[in-house]
Amino acid sequence: MDQETVGNIVLLAIVTLISVVQNGFFAHKVEHESKTHNGRSFQRTGPLAFERVYTANQNCVDAYPTFLVMLWSAGLLCSQVPAAFAGLMYLFVRQKYFVGYLGERTQSTPGYIFGKRIILFLFAMSLAGILNYFLIAFFGSDFENYIKTVTTT
C-alpha cells in the first residue's frame, strides 16, 4: 500500500483498533462478573450485577457493526478527519453508556441518545459523499473540495 492510501485511512484504522480494545474491555468485564458469581463456568443468567454487565455488553455488540460501517463509509466517501473524530466521540459515549448501564439505568440514557446522534451524523456524511460522487458524474461539480476546506480549517 502506498503512503498516500495509508494516509487516507490511518485515522479510521486507529479508531477501529481503539474500538476493538474497548470491546475487549467490555468482554473482560462480563467474564470477570461471570466468574465472580458463577465460579469457573460461564452462564448467561445470574445476579442483577451480572445481568446488567451482560446486557450492556450485548447492547454495545449489537450496535458495533453499524458503527463500523458508518465510520468507514463516512471516512472514505466524505472526509476522514471529522469521521474519525465522530468515531472517537462515539467510543467515549459508548463507554459512558456501558458504565451508566451498570449503575442506574437512567444514567445510560444520555449516552444512548448521543450515540444515536453520532451514528446519524456519520450517516449524513456518507450520504454527502455519495451525493458528491453523483454530482461529479452528472454535472462535473466537486463539492468534496469545499467539504475538505471547511473541515481542515
UniProtKB/Swiss-Prot annotation:
PROSITE patterns: FLAP_GST2_LTC4S. The C-terminal part after residue 140 is mostly disordered. One of its GO terms (biological process) is leukotriene biosynthetic process. Keywords: Endoplasmic reticulum, Leukotriene biosynthesis, Membrane, Nucleus, Transmembrane, Transmembrane helix. The chain crosses the membrane at residues 9-30, 53-77, 81-102, 116-128. Its main location: nucleus. GO terms for cellular component: endoplasmic reticulum membrane; nuclear envelope; nuclear membrane. Pfam families: MAPEG. PANTHER family: ARACHIDONATE 5-LIPOXYGENASE-ACTIVATING PROTEIN, MICROSOMAL GLUTATHIONE S-TRANSFERASE. Residues 108-115 dip into the membrane without crossing it. It is a multi-pass membrane protein. This is Arachidonate 5-lipoxygenase-activating protein. It is found in: Nucleus membrane; Endoplasmic reticulum membrane. It comes from the Eukaryota. Residues 31-52, 103-107 are cytoplasmic. Residues 1-8, 78-80, 129-153 are lumenal. InterPro entries: 5_LipOase_AP, FLAP/GST2/LTC4S_CS, MAPEG, MAPEG-like_dom_sf, Membr-assoc_MAPEG. GO terms for molecular function: arachidonate binding; enzyme activator activity; glutathione peroxidase activity; glutathione transferase activity; leukotriene-C4 synthase activity. The keyword Nucleus applies. Required for leukotriene biosynthesis by ALOX5 (5-lipoxygenase). Anchors ALOX5 to the membrane. Binds arachidonic acid, and could play an essential role in the transfer of arachidonic acid to ALOX5. Binds to MK-886, a compound that blocks the biosynthesis of leukotrienes.
